[in-house]
Each structure stands twice: as structure tokens, then as C-alpha cells.
């Protein structure tokens, strides 16, 4: 048996967690550069906001319903996600973090102590008590069925936020009323293709010929069908595979037109990518930098390009990665308004593969110690120590005009209470 714990409106819920005044108010969160709606709580959905709505188009709805709007605060969301995971891991020994707001749990052995429904309610209550985040919990024989149960838990209030189904008749009833689009991994194109075969509900898919499904759509959807029948095909991944690449990129708040500004942006991306690389305890040999204009602009000259450097010796040193990212100069073109840039790291290896006795190049002396100091200082506050090449006054930085404080990672952001 598997449980899926999914936070309701994660980003919006994180914003409400430190703002009691927003408890009964509609809340929505915007994408990068405050462009589109990417998260909504229940009241914001009820007011008519939809995922992907452009902010400028829905401002009348926002003003009419007094909806609280926030820029995306990824630092806060990542911190709250870690707290959410820690609570669940304190109650279950086998946990897989599927996304920032979703965790799978292996429920093996749980029924010896309590019912699955009681376990689901305990998970939900402990997460709420320790983080204020409200979750939906779905429990079933397979991960795909647990996803369906979670959908039911979040859709119908009468469930109390928990649906645990091991009864064939009740599962069939649920599958008969849910459209096939609710199945994990079934996208819009697959849904349309299935409809032409007469498969419109989840139950229709569960009853489909697995050989035909495999021939038409591939082995992954065939396994999904088997999961709908109660056969576990997707196991719990407690230790996700190591990343094959790291990408740090941003769309700019305003167009970048000078090489100096772009070099500062790329230096910042390279520094952040190197930090992520060290967090993964990996080393890289390939560093790429890319720049592009907006594909949606009819006024700007269209241009996109990428430059790549391959190192002789793998590194995780920010200085080396930043230097390699200066390959930007090879692809830079003047008189162009750039909308986005980024740095990608690839060809990863562990520390044991860093040295090659036949190479003349060797890592910088004291590199690891210096990077450890850099990371240690920056753990106490973002960008407490940074590279001069990143610049100070980044007018081109991502637009986040409604950014909330970093309540959980910055002492200066903790609200002050006064007792009189």
C-alpha cells in the first residue's frame, strides 16, 4: 500500500502560513517576473482565477475580490517543503519526495498498529500542526491509485482530506466517475487519443487491452493500466538517481542590451549552478552558457545561441565554472535585446574521478576548503558572500515587486511581536 501526501495550493499556503490576517482571504502567487498566475488557494479559484492567467488581464478580478498577490518566493517554498518532508519522515520510515509539495509513503506494516484511514489522518494533522500546511492524503495499493485517491480527498470536502481505498467496489466507483485525464501521466494529447478508442473514464482505461495500450502508447502507459488494476509497477524511490545536469536560468525583468550586464547575470547563474553542484556532491566537466531573445516579441531581432566549454579536470569550484561561463563573449551580439540567459552544467562525476595522472591540469590548491567556507557563510543568509563579477545593482534582475520576506531562512525577516 502507498500513500500520497499532497499540500493544497503549496505556494499560496506558504504565504498564508506567516500571515494570520490572510486566513480567510483569497491568495494567489505569480510566476517569474510577475507574469502569470501559478498558484491559488481555494478562495482565489472560487473568485475565478485560473492557472496561467496573465496578471495584467486578471487585475480587475483581483481588485474586485481583494485577492492578496505575491511574487514567487522560492527560498520560502523550498524551506517549507523541507519542513513538510521532515514531519512525514518522522511518522514513516520509507518516503519518496516526488515534488516540492508531494510525498509518497510505503505503508507496509502500518495496519499492524492502526487503520490506513487513521494513519492518513495522523499524517494530515501532524503536517498541519507543525507547518500550518493543509494536505490531501490518498492511500491505495499502487502509486497510480494513491494519486486518484488523493485527487478525491482534495476534491470532496466530505472525505475530510483523506481517502484510503482497498475495496475493489469502491475503487471501481471512483474510477467510473473520474475522467481519464485525472490519471497520473495522461496528458492532453494522450487523453484525446484515448477518446478516439472509446476510453473516456479511468475505469475504461483500467479495462483496456494492455497489449493494445503498449503497442499504441508505449510501456509506461501499459504499466499505468496495470497499476489501475492493483498491480504495483512503480516502486518507491527513496534515493532518487543523481542529476545528469544542472541548469540555472532566468527571464529578465527588463531586456539586457549590454555585455557588462549580461556578464554579471551569467556570473550569478554560474555561481548558483556551482553551489547546486556541490550540494549534489558532484563534479562537472562541461559548462554551457546560453542567451536568447523573446520568441514572442515582434519588434526585437530574433537570436539564440549557446557556447560550451569542456574541462580537462572535473570541478565544483565556483571560480572555474564562472571563468568557463565567460564563453558568453563568443556568442554575444551587439544591438540585440536579450530576454533570457542561463548556465548549464553536465558530464558529472564523483570526487574519485576528479584526478587524472596523465593530465597536466590539477585542481586549485585549497579549492574544496574555500568553497566550504563560501557555502557555510551563505547558509547564514543568501549572497552574504558573492563574486564581484555578479555586480551589485542588477537593474535587469527578475521582477518580483510583491515578494514576501524569507521568514524561515533570514533572521531579519522574522516578525517582531511586542507585549505591552
Swiss-Prot record:
Gene Ontology MF, one: DNA-directed DNA polymerase activity
Gene Ontology cellular-component annotations: cytosol
UniProt-listed Gene3D superfamilies: 3.30.70.270, 3.40.1170.60, 5' to 3' exonuclease, C-terminal subdomain, DNA polymerase, Y-family, little finger domain
Any one of the GO BP annotations: SOS response
Keywords noted in UniProt: DNA damage, DNA repair, Plasmid, SOS mutagenesis, SOS response
Entry-linked Pfam families: DUF4113, IMS, IMS_C
Residues of the UmuC domain: 2-187
Top-rank taxon, per record: Bacteria
CDD domains: PolY_Pol_V_umuC
PANTHER family, sorted: DNA REPAIR POLYMERASE UMUC / TRANSFERASE FAMILY MEMBER, PROTEIN UMUC
Note: The mucAB operon is the plasmid-borne analog of the E.coli umuDC operon.
Similarity section: Belongs to the DNA polymerase type-Y family.
Purpose of the protein: Involved in UV protection and mutation.
Protein name as catalogued: Protein MucB
Encoding gene, per UniProt annotation: mucB
Amino acid at each position: 500500500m502507498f500513500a500520497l501526501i499532497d499540500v493544497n495550493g503549496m505556494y499560496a499556503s506558504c504565504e498564508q502560513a506567516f500571515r494570520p490576517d490572510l486566513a480567510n482571504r483569497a491568495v494567489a502567487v505569480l510566476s517569474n517576473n510577475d507574469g502569470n498566475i501559478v498558484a491559488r488557494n481555494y478562495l482565489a479559484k472560487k473568485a475565478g482565477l485560473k492557472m496561467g492567467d496573465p496578471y495584467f488581464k486578471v487585475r480587475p478580478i483581483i481588485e474586485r475580490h481583494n485577492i492578496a498577490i505575491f511574487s514567487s518566493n522560492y527560498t520560502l517554498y523550498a524551506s517549507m517543503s523541507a519542513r513538510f518532508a521532515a514531519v512525514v519522515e518522522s511518522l514513516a520510515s520509507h518516503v519518496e519526495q516526488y515534488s516540492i509539495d508531494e510525498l509518497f509513503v510505503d505503508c507496509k506494516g502500518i495496519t499492524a498498529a492502526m487503520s490506513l484511514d487513521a494513519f492518513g489522518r495522523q499524517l494530515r494533522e501532524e503536517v498541519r500542526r507543525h507547518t500550518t500546511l493543509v494536505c490531501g492524503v490518498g492511500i491505495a495499493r499502487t502509486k497510480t491509485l494513491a494519486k486518484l485517491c488523493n485527487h478525491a480527498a482534495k476534491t470532496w470536502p466530505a472525505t475530510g482530506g483523506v481517502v484510503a481505498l482497498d475495496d475493489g467496489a469502491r475503487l471501481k466507483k471512483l474510477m467510473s466517475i473520474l475522467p481519464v485525464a485525472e490519471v497520473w501521466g495522461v496528458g492532453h494529447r494522450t487523453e484525446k487519443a484515448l477518446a478516439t478508442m472509446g476510453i473516456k473514464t479511468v475505469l475504461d482505461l483500467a479495462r483496456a487491452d494492455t497489449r493494445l495500450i503498449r503497442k499504441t502508447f508505449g510501456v509506461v502507459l501499459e504499466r499505468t493500466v496495470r497499476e489501475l488494476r492493483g498491480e504495483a509497477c512503480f516502486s518507491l524511490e527513496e534515493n532518487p538517481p543523481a542529476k545528469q545536469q544542472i541548469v540555472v536560468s532566468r527571464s529578465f525583468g527588463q531586456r539586457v542590451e549590454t555585455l557588462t550586464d549580461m556578464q554579471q547575470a551569467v556570473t550569478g547563474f554560474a555561481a548558483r549552478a556551482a553551489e547546486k553542484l556541490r550540494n549534489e556532491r558532484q563534479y562537472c566537466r562541461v559548462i554551457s552558457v546560453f542567451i536568447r531573445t523573446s520568441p514572442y516579441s515582434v519588434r526585437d531581432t530574433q537570436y539564440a545561441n549557446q557556447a560550451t566549454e569542456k574541462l580537462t579536470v572535473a570541478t565544483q569550484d565556483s571560480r572555474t565554472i564562472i571563468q568557463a561561463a565567460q564563453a558568453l563573449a563568443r556568442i554575444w551580439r551587439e544591438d540585440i535585446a536579450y530576454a533570457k540567459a542561463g548556465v548549464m552544467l553536465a558530464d558529472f562525476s564523483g570526487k574519485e574521478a576528479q584526478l587524472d595522472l596523465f593530465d597536466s591540469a590539477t585542481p586549485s590548491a585549497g579549492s574544496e576548503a574555500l568553497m566550504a567556507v563560501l557555502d557555510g557563510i551563505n547558509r547564514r543568509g543568501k549572497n552574504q558572500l558573492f563574486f564581484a563579477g555578479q555586480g551589485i545593482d542588477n537593474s535587469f534582475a527578475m521582477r518580483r515587486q510583491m515578494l514576501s520576506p524569507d521568514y524561515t531562512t533570514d533572521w531579519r525577516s522574522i516578525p517582531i511581536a511586542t507585549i505591552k
